[in-house]
Amino acid sequence: VIRGNHHDAWEFGAADPIRGMVALMEEARVISELVKQGYKPKRTLMFCAWDGEEPALLGSTEWVEDHQEELKKKAVAYINSDGNARGFIYAAGSHGYETFFNEIAAEVKDPQTGVSIRDRSYAKVLADADRAGKSRIYGNKYMKLSALGAGSDYSPFIQYLGISALNIGFGGEGSGGEYHSI
């Protein structure tokens, strides 16, 4: 399982990529602590920091090309997160991950509200929907994954090698004016 994020930015990168990179580094630190306590992941985990994402996905693409034979044999998933901010969970990816994503999102508590991150996002979707939309989605908290485009480091994994991918993050509660700056 490959977990990645880029570390290059157009400007100072306060939101993209630093927020995503901080999350990746904390995940790696916590997994490391768990391993020291005896936890053994069922799969090999790789934490990757890519360069050259902003101009053309250069780092991840070159790495995928250089390691394609091993990746074809061993890689089962790529998980990406460019940005995290205050707000609501969002995800795009290989649709085989929908149930997995929904199960996890239903279990993770939002620290601000105490409800699950899935329920918090559902409440926002419901509040923002028009009348027809409300009647269509009311009571259905299942979150559909959006389709992945070609705009981040998941691209070479899914588009070049066919490795399933997931792009996750949080956002939607701020102006986002600092996206590519500080």
Which stretches of residues belong to each language-model region?
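Metal-dependent peptidase/peptidase-like ectodomains
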Residues: W50-I182
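Alpha-helical metal-binding/catalytic segments enriched in His/Glu/Asp
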Residues: R3-L57
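Structural motif
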Residues: V1-I2, A77
